[in-house]
Amino acid sequence: MENGFLLINKEQGKTSFETLFPIKKYFNTNHVGHAGILDKFASGILIALVGKYTKLANYFMSLDKEYVAEFRFGLETDTLDPNGRIVNKTDYIPNLEDIDLKLKDFVGEIYQSPPRFSSVHINGSRAYKLALNGKFFEIKKRRVNVYDIQRLSYDFSSSLLSLKISCSKGTYIRSIARDLAYSLNSCAYVSSLKRTKVGIFRLEDSTLCKNLSKASLISLESLKSFEKVCIDSSKINLVKNGAYVEIQININEFKILKSREGEILAVIKGIDLNKYKYVIIF
């Protein structure tokens, strides 16, 4: 079975789950997952995990993200995207000076409520399922970090604001559109969204599913943030059997265990000072 991860350029109009179908077919395995949902209306980089690398999903999901988004003022949909039902309208379209002033409030550590149509769990159910069934529920605000917002363009005549946003995991761009518009006494939704970066991985290095090849599969060697630890030949069998080997490691740190010949043996994650768990054993 193949093991590795892929930088996929997800096309607009497909769900993240649907995007995995050709990958499963190409590698002839159902052991394929993704690390971080991209909405159906969105496009951009999606990290797909193949084989044992699916166990690294939490790591990839924890990485910072970058998006290019377009907000349309004057209309709000229930989903806060182009596919939703219009629930709010206004003739007031904010001016550029006010937008630039308010954007500063959305940089740094902020609290936001995820959209009602999202995959957030509410008492064991997905929020979007409750919303589809017309259920009333509240979503608690969550703390996220927005590192930078760059205004790319603003067309007052079409009410379209284009932004580049760098943020932490769990940040909802649709919530930023909603909250920014409300702060300007208007309303808005995200008319287009493209994810351009996940951690160090960029959209320009991704591939469309139709262009998949064995060369598209990336190994752990590319993860520069994972320190490589050389294991003595006398301890290789211990590692392959998931036994403890003394290794210096910090909490939440990932390390790759290799033989002196360069064979990747395992991936470990620190759970305390110099204590770890095996994430993958090859």
From Swiss-Prot:
It holds the Pfam family TruB_N. The keyword Aminoacyl-tRNA synthetase does not apply. SUPFAM superfamilies: Pseudouridine synthase. The active site is at D39. Signal peptide: none annotated. This is tRNA pseudouridine synthase B. InterPro entries: PsdUridine_synth_cat_dom_sf, PsdUridine_synth_N, tRNA_psdUridine_synth_TruB. GO terms for biological process: mRNA pseudouridine synthesis; tRNA pseudouridine synthesis. Belongs to the pseudouridine synthase TruB family. Type 1 subfamily. It catalyses: uridine(55) in tRNA = pseudouridine(55) in tRNA. It comes from Borreliella afzelii (strain PKo) (Borrelia afzelii). The lineage of its organism: Bacteria, Pseudomonadati, Spirochaetota, Spirochaetia, Spirochaetales. One of its GO terms (molecular function) is tRNA pseudouridine(55) synthase activity.
